[in-house]
């Protein structure tokens, strides 16, 4: 009872905080000069992170197993992972290029997890026999870590495509473009500072210098993030294969979840392979990664929505009216 009450409190704190953060984030996108609000948004993210961490620890202690047994718990863990990705550049004291992707991703994931759609999953339940294994934490956590990382990398690639295919793109009037500020807020500040510095120089700068510089940074970050995510996905699939052999007597059953996990792995393997070809590097490889973004959501959320196959534990069903 104590843990259930604590989880309830932490869930409401995280949902309330995330609602405030969403409001602040939207305001800062519309009014660029309000830097103080950006700091408040970051503090709200920190408060949400500690609330999520407390929730995960509380449920782990109360249930006796790592909280990854249904869609609700996995979404909470996914938002926690996205915040970790958001924090890594800050710990390294480097420019946080990922913040424009990780911040809204964390907000949306946590907001959906704590919404009323998953109410029936809020209560911790006893694991079914197939899930009562030490592989639960290893396999599922690796898969969710890979999903979070690959989603961030795919969004960076999608951002690259948006910039390259947008005609008449004026980097000197970005303040008027709310959509671009959503994805490239920190990049815009960097480009404004760069432009101001170069105005005082005497050497010529070609017109698309700023656009080229931004796309190169996005391409580099996307490749690095997806490479990490692909490694985590590979480890997660291998762990799942070993677990499947213990639980069902076969390493691979072509279950819908397994099939889409293989498709996801193949898509990002193609992306990494295409990076070795100079003719495919950049726009073409970014297109492959953007397709991967949709594939990940089908693999992770779509299969749970259908509730079919051997991986249908804790699947999501729409509440009846």
UniProtKB/Swiss-Prot annotation:
Cell compartment(s), UniProt: Plastid, Chloroplast thylakoid membrane
Pfam annotation, one family: Cytochrom_C_asm
Primary location: plastid
Ranges that cross the membrane: 9-29, 44-64, 68-88, 143-163, 225-245, 259-273, 288-308
HAMAP family given in the database record: CytC_CcsA (MF_01391)
Function statement: Required during biogenesis of c-type cytochromes (cytochrome c6 and cytochrome f) at the step of heme attachment.
PANTHER family: CYTOCHROME B_B6 PROTEIN-RELATED, HEME EXPORTER PROTEIN C
Name of the protein in its database record: Cytochrome c biogenesis protein CcsA
